[in-house]
Amino acid sequence: MAAAADTFLFTSESVNEGHPDKLCDQISDAVLDACLAQDAESKVACETCTKTNLVMVFGEITTKANVDYEKIVADTCREIGFVSPDVGLDADNCKVLVYIEQQSPDIAQGVHGHLTKRPEDIGAGDQGHMFGYATDETPELMPLSHVLATKLGARLTEVRKNGTCAWLRPDGKTQVTVEYYNENGAMVPIRVHTVLISTQHDETVTNDEIAADLKEHVIKPVIPEKYLDENTIFHLNPSGRFVIGGPHGDAGLTGRKIIIDTYGGWGAHGGGAFSRKDPTKVDRSGAYIARQAAKSIVASGLARRCIVQISYAIGVPEPLSVFVDTYGTGKIHDREILKIVKENFDFRPGMIAIALDLKKGGNRYLKTAAYGHFGREDPDFTWEAAKTLKWEKPQA
């Protein structure tokens, strides 16, 4: 066991699918799914905002698809659980505003030449820099603090929808503080220091009932017993009342939960949101391939922890830069690992879309829009499949 002086605390948070910002992410990605299902070449930049009894969908979409935006809004809200004004929004009676224009032809010609370019020649949809991160502290190769916060939120939704905790409402937030030990650059979780859950609830339940149910039905099934001890702190609905929630409690907007979507504050973030964007937007596709690269490095045993950065210029296929850091945990020098990354991954946007099958619709992107884009066991999350890396090992 590490001495107390050698440990530190790190905190990650998450929000439920009923949080107003996450509602907007899900509507935007449901629109993207609908477009791609009918037209794999759809160019989508679809924002959503919401407030009491109102959802507005707006942005730029160029597609051959016939999209019923009002139905997508209603179906998404209903599936989350927004079915009456008292829970924050009524899916079947809220006002829906749609303001959609086509993608700028200036952007279109620079990025994909109005569909005349080969996949390997498709330029990045914008400038920017993206990061992928992986760590060996969990089976998912994700940070434990982030994994636990995310799973607590998902469990809140599960016990709400299956009736285990019928007093729950859709909105809610979680936060987990983990005590860590830095083992020569690798992160080793020691214990869970603090668990915070703030969840929307109905009028009838007491705070004591909320605390008891959250401990029994949410925390115990999610957090391994080995991480909990007599000193673990629990803050369960500490404000004392959370009846008003969803868009009634707070306005929501697509793209405001980018740290929750990624690594919970670990690694780094280039600033670009994922939801609402088709695969030509490297904010999304670049971050996905960077995660696969970082995960493949850790899964292969080349490092215990790894971050990968890539950067782009609008209209240019090749990345401007690729960077790798293993935080001192690499089995070989980082410059050799960088060579391996470059040899095994094609970072051109058109080739990323092919390698990760990113033009497929259905409900693929909707699934990413709540409970994290990374560390998920789902065949649609193709970037989570670690590649078997090929490289020429240096001669002894």
From Swiss-Prot:
Gene, per the UniProt record: SAM2
Subunit structure: Homotetramer.
Cofactor requirements of the protein: Mn(2+); Mg(2+); Co(2+); K(+)
Entry GO terms, CC: cytoplasm
Binding-site residues, Mg(2+): E13
GO BP term, pick one: one-carbon metabolic process
Protein's name in the database: S-adenosylmethionine synthase 2
Keyword Nucleotide-binding: yes
Keywords annotated in UniProt: ATP-binding, Cobalt, Cytoplasm, Magnesium, Metal-binding, Nucleotide-binding, One-carbon metabolism, Potassium, Transferase
Compartment annotation: Cytoplasm
Coiled-coil features, chain-numbered ranges: none
EC number, UniProt record: 2.5.1.6
Source superkingdom: Eukaryota
The keyword Cell membrane is assigned to this record: no
GO molecular function terms listed in the Swiss-Prot or TrEMBL record: ATP binding; metal ion binding; methionine adenosyltransferase activity
Residues noted as binding K(+) in the record, renumbered to the chain: E47
Source species: Dianthus caryophyllus (Carnation)
Lineage, broadest ranks: Eukaryota, Viridiplantae, Streptophyta, Embryophyta, Tracheophyta
Function summary: Catalyzes the formation of S-adenosylmethionine from methionine and ATP. The reaction comprises two steps that are both catalyzed by the same enzyme: formation of S-adenosylmethionine (AdoMet) and triphosphate, and subsequent hydrolysis of the triphosphate.
Cross-referenced HAMAP family: S_AdoMet_synth1 (MF_00086)
Residue sites binding ATP per the record: H19, D171, G172, K173, S239, G240, R241, F242, D250, R256, K257, A273, K277, K281
Predominant cellular place of this UniProt entry's protein: cytoplasm
